[in-house]
Amino acid sequence: MRLVFAGTPAVAVPSLTALAARFEVAAVITREDAPLGRKRILTPSPVAIAAEELGLSVIRANRLREEAIERVRVLRPDVGVVVAYGGLVHEPLLSLPRRGWVNLHFSLLPRWRGAAPVQHALIAGDRETGAAVFQLVPELDAGDVFGELRRLIRPDETAGELLDDLARSGARLLADTVAALADGTAVATPQSGEPVAAPKLGIADAKLDLTRPADEVYARFRGVTPEPGAWALLDGERFKIHAVRPTAAGVLPPGAVVADGKRILAGTGSRPLELVTVQPAGKRVMAAADWWRGAGGEAVLS
């Protein structure tokens, strides 16, 4: 089975590695090198780095347009595979591979179609999630499903932790699906149920509303960690919150911050949450207790 792979971030690397171990990867499509860090140094994507380490041909393209399409046409792949590429596959590229394109998506479709399925699952308080491999069609994440895996969501799991786990287990599912396509045993089933959208999250979505119950605040914290990154306002500036814990402490006014022994607690609409690691505006990441001492023992988050 000769394939073309399209992916960009680190979560796509396990899939590329699994596929390269079992099939001929004719080329890897990934987004162009991007400036990163304070010095804005042009940096290859994690998939580009992995592909070059595997000795694979790399096509860098932020949009799958004429040049990328022509390069894929020449390769004559049997199938195209997409894992978090960061762009849509349109015609005529969609029909170029003999078996079309398949996509590894990190949710149980049709729930959470879109760019941020793991984040939305956590924010919504879902107890179960998974990954699915489906046939790519023009409608977003709407194709027939070849296979899926299911798993429970741990109560303290962040989006980053859950996504890393699904990336590993999903890679095995994806490679097995491509093998089934190769030997003619793959069977796809139409999606069943009401679709739910999972659009990309922005900075505004990561703000914690401390007037809401603690369970809701904690669910949003987990869903936006590590990206876009949870925050609240402190003296009108963005106060980043890198780690929190649920508590059974007594009720505090929403946003009120107090010390309780060695713990730093922040009030919500129900029980407080413990602030563990924070980052005040313009400062480094630090333990909440260190920040509290420097703040003079008085702060209100909003």
Curated annotation (Swiss-Prot):
It holds the Pfam family Formyl_trans_N. Gene3D superfamilies: 3.40.50.12230. It comes from the Bacteria. Keywords: Protein biosynthesis, Transferase. It is an enzyme of class 2 (transferase). GO terms for molecular function: methionyl-tRNA formyltransferase activity. GO terms for cellular component: cytosol. InterPro entries: Fmt, Formyl_trans_C, Formyl_transf_N, Formyl_transf_N_sf, Formyl_transferase-like_C_sf, Met-tRNA-FMT_C, Met-tRNA-FMT_N. Its EC number is 2.1.2.9. It catalyses: L-methionyl-tRNA(fMet) + (6R)-10-formyltetrahydrofolate = N-formyl-L-methionyl-tRNA(fMet) + (6S)-5,6,7,8-tetrahydrofolate + H(+). (6S)-5,6,7,8-tetrahydrofolate binds at residues 107-110. The keyword Cell inner membrane does not apply. Belongs to the Fmt family. Attaches a formyl group to the free amino group of methionyl-tRNA(fMet). The formyl group appears to play a dual role in the initiator identity of N-formylmethionyl-tRNA by promoting its recognition by IF2 and preventing the misappropriation of this tRNA by the elongation apparatus. This is Methionyl-tRNA formyltransferase.
